[in-house]
């Protein structure tokens, strides 16, 4: 009887301790788990009326984070991260590598980073608990302080602190996008696939195109918490004209801004919002600006109009 009571106490104590944890503590534990744990997650992504199954592997090999993301439907498409290098492998083009700290297309990069940096833009609120993928989960809401971005909610596994479900919501709580784990396996060692990825000779990181003199575009306004992450040149599909590309993020939402000489490139003309992904076009002086991102259309329009050339 004494042994049984000790076992029950060992099971109850962690859950009791979790009752006193703040929403930020839960998120900090998630951040550490995403960086440090060895695991395999099978997921489904609901986006724009489509269901997309994914498999995500994560592990540590010789002190380096290794991750692998596979899209299970459609043409083969994978992404591999070794340290801060991400390589994209697609069926219709040669593999290529870029510098990136996390894999895109799954959880927000901020989830594995400094959670405190999100506090300037989002309020963390502890929600209820529910069962997801056969595991008890604690829900945390991330509510924006203004209407320039959407809100989010995430359910964390109460044992591993890994995310089990992630929702993007409008101000009136309409679901725009969802990522849900259907099976989560915590591993004791890196799977063979990640060991091979660590040893493999991936393509070198591609060089950014040289920036043209005078193309110093600046923003007179950005929503609080957003900053410029990258600047380079892109070539639009079907066009030989280079356009200026500026990538913005607040850690949760990402925005892409494209700038071209008016009439030089076939930029989209319509305004649209579809399942959280918005697109706007604006004319700024002699330039055409396209802004694309999972934020309200009004935010994109204001960002595009605030561009100035210095």
Model-identified regions with their sequence ranges:
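Short, surface-exposed coil-to-beta transition loops
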Residues: 51-55, 148-152, 164, 176-178, ...
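Positively charged n-region of N-terminal signal peptides that target proteins for export
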Residues: 1-4
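N-terminal signal peptide c-region/cleavage motif recognized by signal peptidases
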Residues: 12-14
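N-terminal mature ectodomain segment of secretory-pathway/periplasmic proteins
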Residues: 18-94, 122-130, 136-139, 143-151, ...
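Short, well-ordered beta-strand elements
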Residues: 166, 286-294
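Gly/Pro-enriched, hydrophobic low-complexity segments
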Residues: 133-200
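Acidic/charged, solvent-exposed loop-and-adjacent secondary-structure segments enriched in E/D, K/R, S/T
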Residues: 88-110
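Short, solvent-exposed recognition patches
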Residues: 200-285, 298
């Amino acid at each position: 009887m004494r042994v049984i009571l000790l076992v029950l106490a060992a099971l109850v104590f962690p859950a009791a301790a979790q009752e006193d944890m703040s929403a930020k503590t839960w998120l900090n534990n998630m951040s550490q788990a995403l960086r440090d744990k060895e695991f395999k997650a099978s997921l489904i992504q609901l986006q724009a009326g489509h269901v997309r199954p994914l498999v995500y592997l994560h592990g540590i090999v010789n002190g380096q984070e290794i991750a692998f993301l596979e899209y299970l439907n459609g043409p083969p498409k994978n992404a591999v991260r070794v340290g801060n290098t991400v390589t994209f492998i697609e069926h219709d083009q040669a593999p290529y590598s870029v510098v990136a700290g996390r894999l895109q297309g799954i959880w927000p990069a901020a989830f594995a980073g400094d959670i405190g940096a999100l506090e300037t833009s989002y309020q963390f609120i502890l929600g209820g608990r529910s069962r997801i993928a056969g595991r008890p989960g604690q829900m945390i809401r991330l509510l924006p302080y203004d209407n320039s971005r959407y809100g989010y909610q995430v359910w964390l596994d109460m044992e591993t602190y890994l995310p089990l479900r992630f929702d993007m919501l409008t101000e009136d709580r309409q679901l725009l996008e969802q990522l849900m784990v259907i099976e989560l396996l915590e591993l004791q060692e890196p799977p063979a696939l990640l060991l091979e990825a660590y040893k493999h000779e991936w393509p070198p990181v591609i060089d950014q195109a040289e920036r043209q003199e005078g193309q110093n575009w600046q923003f007179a306004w950005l929503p609080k918490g957003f900053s410029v992450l990258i600047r380079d040149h892109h070539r639009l599909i079907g066009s030989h004209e280079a356009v200026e590309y500026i990538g913005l993020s607040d850690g949760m939402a990402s925005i892409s801004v494209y700038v071209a000489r008016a009439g030089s490139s076939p930029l989209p003309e319509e305004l649209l919002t579809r399942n959280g992904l918005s697109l706007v076009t604006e004319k700024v002086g002699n330039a055409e600006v396209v802004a694309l991102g999972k934020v309200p259309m009004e935010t994109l329009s204001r960002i595009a109009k605030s561009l100035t050339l210095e």
